[in-house]
Amino acid sequence: MGPPIAAAAQAAREALAPRGKLRVGAFPGSPLSMVRDRGTGEMHGLCIDLGKELAKRLDVPFEQVSYQRIAEVLAGMKAGDVDFTVSNATPARAADVSFSQTLISLELGYLVPAASPIASLPDVDKPGLRVGVTQGSTSQGTIPKLLRNATVVPAQNAARAIEMFERRELDLFATNKPTLFEMSDQMPGARVLEGRWGVENIAVAIPRGREAAMEYLRRFVEEVQTSGLLTQAVERAGLRGVVQAQ
């Protein structure tokens, strides 16, 4: 995709890929991480594409390490099994991993199924409504603070949430809009509500204790942003709901 960052330090390479390969943690169902191309069957997404680009620049092999959801990816990183991922950069997560500067920002919203009477954000917080969130996600921690009357229902991942909609176990699902739009593509008649309940700031995450790599990582992010590589990756991933980095 682009030339290697000039004068890449061996210390940074060793810090980012200590096993001689870049182990990229990803989970299915979100174009932010990885989704399956309906035409080719190939797995791709922002995390996968940026991980491949960084591995290329480091001149090390790329290795995909798959999990079911972001909480498992971050647990794998904390355990030393993952070198690189892309995640919402929250203060809670920053206690366990190190983040680059913001890559992109994403709107947070709600998905409703076909024929839902819910038309706008003020309709969401009503007694009896069941709002799905991904187990271990930032949304799981935030939505209960925003909604006083609706019931929050954890789901293993986006695929399980779609199944829960089919069984009429959910009335809405809350997460970032790229994931919601990806889900809506698989649910005829489903809608992503207008407006947002928050914004996620997405950054590259690496394990704590690899400070020798942070300057290299900062330059990598800066270069993919200014060169157009990030824009290309966002378009290739089909990310919708992207707003200016905050």
Where are these regions (language model features)?
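Extended ligand-binding regions for polar small-molecule ligands
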Residues: 1-7, 45-57, 116-122, 128-130, ...
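Extracytoplasmic small-molecule ligand-binding "clamshell" domains
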Residues: 2-88, 154, 227, 236
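Short loop->beta-strand "edge-of-pocket" segments that line small-molecule binding or catalytic clefts
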Residues: 20-28, 43-44, 122-139, 151-152
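Paired acidic/hydrophobic, glycine-rich loop segments that form the ligand-binding mouth/hinge
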Residues: 25, 83-87, 171-176, 191
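A mature extracytoplasmic/lumenal domain signature
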Residues: 26-28, 66-69, 103, 114, ...
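Periplasmic-binding protein-like
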Residues: 28, 104-115, 177, 181-222, ...
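Solvent-exposed loop/turn segments at secondary-structure junctions
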Residues: 29-32, 70-72, 84, 89-94, ...
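Acidic, polar ligand-binding/catalytic clefts
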Residues: 48, 52, 56, 61-125, ...
